[in-house]
């Protein structure tokens, strides 16, 4: 019998412009509480929270508590560590708390219940449990036979240890799988047990006629702390028709050529939306080479009876890329983007770049990191795709 934990999952309204949050838990409401300053006597403070929820050690907090009611408040921060306004109003913890008796991270990836959630390359996201500084994620091809404890399942097909609260699977997953996660301390000793297994299925379906084939811009995520399972950051989430997302974060156009047969062939698609080359061009690969890759991807699609539709490449902001990722951008990027986009515009295409081509760098309010559109840019891209696809579907 596994010991029951006394934890609580606290959830607050998400701020789509936040890079991280700071959470304070207060013992009653102090008389001199200032919404612009940290509370001196806070029972709990965590300023490194990257999604709008936290798993709280309720038993410990109750032992320290002297008043009748615990309150919490949060404030959001930007990339430079500046608060995005003051703390929220202090609210009773109980009003936003879900009791958790399992000492395990809480899975956040909601696969399959929303548009844009069908990912060939899954992302496993979770809220960490108290005391854990790293996590092991396990993927199995059957429901794990050992739901409790910390031992690996005999059905394990993939596992990885990370200090982050999201993990990008580097393998395509076609079929039905389960994933779970457990916490560990910095020595690698278990903190609690496995989370309950989460089932997900990605398989060809006659209902899904459109595939999205690209890199991280299409895979989803942005604003540094949002991943492809934060669907507000995926343009596929705002489309008026179902899609399967065959994109892989980090891909160059050459990688997209290489994995085409393995990753696109199983899905019986009518249309393939192709957006690739951004990572190649910013690293200094020539426009000619990227155009050859895009041409080859189109030919491979046609050979499978799929109609290729190219998406133009929105501009970059090299200063923001440098700040967010510490990566340089090729000096001639504007010229090479213009060359590749001219090729794309000579083919069957959707001009998603046009609304952003002002001759300036991509504005920070549309893309904090200079390459991945934030939620607002993803919405504009989706509107352009919806208008173009309306007549075809």
Located regions from the model:
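Serine-esterase "nucleophile elbow" of acetyl-processing enzymes
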Residues: 188-249, 259-268
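Active-site segments of SGNH/GDSL-like serine hydrolases
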Residues: 275-279, 300-334
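Oxyanion-hole/transition-state-stabilizing segment in secreted/luminal serine hydrolases
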Residues: 225-226, 254-293, 314-319
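Recognizes extended acidic, P/S/T-rich segments that occur
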Residues: 22-67, 139-172
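Extracellular fibronectin type III
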Residues: 79-99, 186-202
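Conserved aromatic anchor
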Residues: 6-17, 120-131
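Catalytic His-Asp segment of secreted/periplasmic serine-dependent ester chemistry enzymes
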Residues: 317-393
């Amino acid at each position: 019998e596994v010991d029951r934990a006394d934890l609580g999952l606290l959830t607050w309204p998400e701020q789509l412009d936040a890079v991280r949050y700071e959470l304070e838990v207060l013992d009653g409401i102090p008389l001199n509480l200032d919404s612009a300053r940290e509370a001196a006597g806070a029972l709990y403070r965590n300023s490194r929270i990257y999604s709008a929820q936290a798993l709280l050690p309720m038993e410990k907090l109750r032992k320290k508590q002297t008043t009748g009611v615990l309150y919490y408040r949060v404030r959001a921060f930007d990339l430079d560590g500046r608060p995005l306004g003051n703390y929220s109003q202090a609210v009773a913890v109980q009003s936003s708390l879900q009791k958790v008796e399992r000492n395990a991270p809480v899975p956040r990836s909601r696969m399959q219940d929303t548009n844009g959630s069908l990912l060939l390359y899954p992302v496993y996201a979770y809220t960490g449990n108290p005391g854990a500084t790293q996590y092991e994620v396990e993927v199995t091809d059957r429901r794990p036979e050992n739901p409790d404890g910390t031992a690996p399942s005999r059905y394990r097909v993939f596992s990885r240890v990370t200090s982050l609260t999201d993990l990008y699977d580097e393998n395509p997953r076609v079929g039905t799988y389960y994933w779970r996660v457990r916490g560990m301390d910095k020595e690698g000793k278990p903190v609690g047990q496995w989370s309950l297994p989460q089932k997900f299925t990605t398989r060809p379906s006659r209902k899904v006629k459109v595939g999205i084939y690209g890199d991280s811009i299409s895979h989803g995520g942005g604003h540094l702390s949002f991943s492809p399972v934060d669907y507000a950051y995926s343009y596929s989430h705002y489309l008026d028709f179902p899609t399967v997302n065959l994109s892989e974060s980090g891909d160059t156009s050459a990688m997209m050529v290489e994995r085409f047969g393995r990753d696109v062939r199983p899905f019986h698609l009518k249309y393939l939306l192709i957006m690739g080359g951004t990572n190649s061009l910013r690293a200094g690969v020539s426009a000619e080479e990227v155009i050859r890759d895009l041409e080859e991807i189109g030919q491979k699609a046609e050979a499978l009876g799929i109609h290729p539709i190219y998406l133009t490449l929105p501009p970059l902001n090299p200063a923001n890329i440098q700040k967010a990722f510490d990566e340089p951008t090729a000096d001639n990027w504007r010229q090479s983007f213009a060359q590749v986009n001219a090729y794309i515009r000579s083919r069957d295409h959707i001009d998603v770049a046009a609304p952003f081509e002002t001759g300036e760098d991509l504005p920070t309010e549309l893309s904090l990191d200079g390459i991945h559109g934030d939620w607002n840019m993803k919405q504009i891209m989706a509107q352009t795709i919806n208008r173009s696809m309306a007549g075809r579907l």
